[in-house]
A protein has these predicted regions:
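A short beta-strand element within beta-rich, extracytoplasmic domains
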Residues: 51-62, 117
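Aromatic- and Gly/Pro-enriched, solvent-exposed loop/edge beta-strand patches characteristic
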Residues: 67-147
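Short, intrinsically disordered N-terminal pre-domain segments
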Residues: 1-15, 190-192
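Extracellular beta-rich ligand/substrate-recognition surface
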Residues: 27-39, 93-98, 178
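Short amphipathic
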Residues: 22, 42-47, 90
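Extended extracellular/luminal ectodomain segments enriched in beta-structured repeat modules
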Residues: 36-39, 47-55
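Short, surface-exposed beta-strand/loop patches at domain edges
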Residues: 121-192
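A short beta-turn/strand-edge loop motif at beta-sheet boundaries
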Residues: 7, 63-67, 176-179
């Protein structure tokens, strides 16, 4: 029986009501900042319940050069590895040449399951923006055991040399497994 349909065995956190306007992301213990360098595509896994979202966002702490753009989206999870697979939605770009929360508007209903939130430094003009990143996060997937460390660390992957203009239809093979090192831009969603 699915975990979310049997309240007697469902963790209290999973029973909380998701309300329109609430934000949803990976549970984070501490943060750091880091540059969003041109051509880098980062992604981290997150389990979503059956839910609709209307925003995907990030937090810029130091503005990039005028005209710099970040692109956000969501990838489906691979069914054979702890890795992103096909693109579910390319939410488009936001200006990262100003500080603060930067959001794209989407209309997406997700079935319960794992998805990968993604950020591409789409266009960097003169100087890269600095983004809020996870340093230490709570691994919501324990005690999953795998030869791949992604679900064990709760971190994510980074692919280099990704062209601007759109998110790749399939997440690039051979991305760097960041393990528990942090350095993944915090991407969040808003519940519709």
């Amino acid at each position: 029986m699915p975990l979310f349909r049997k309240p007697a065995i469902t963790p209290a956190l999973a029973l909380s009501k998701y309300k329109a306007g609430d934000y949803f992301t990976l549970p984070i213990v501490s943060t750091q900042t880091g540059n969003a360098n041109s051509g880098f595509l980062v992604a981290f896994p997150l389990f979503f319940p059956n839910i609709s979202i209307d925003r995907i966002g990030c937090l810029v702490t130091v503005a990039g050069g005028v005209g710099s753009l970040g692109r956000m989206g969501i990838y489906n999870a691979s069914t054979t590895a702890a890795y992103p697979s096909s693109l579910l939605i390319d939410g488009g770009t936001v200006s990262v040449s100003t500080t603060g929360n930067r959001e794209v508007t989407v209309a997406l209903t997700l079935a319960a399951g794992f998805y990968w939130l993604a950020y591409l430094a789409d266009t960097v003009v003169t100087s890269a923006p600095t983004m809020r990143q996870q340093n230490v996060c709570i691994n919501p997937f324990a005690p999953i055991v795998s030869t791949n460390t992604l679900f064990q660390s709760g971190s994510g992957v980074r692919a280099a040399g990704v062209a601007s203009g759109s998110l790749p239809a399939t997440f690039p093979a051979g991305a760097t497994d960041l393990g528990g090192t942090g350095g993944i831009h915090i991407i969040y969603t808003r519940i519709a």
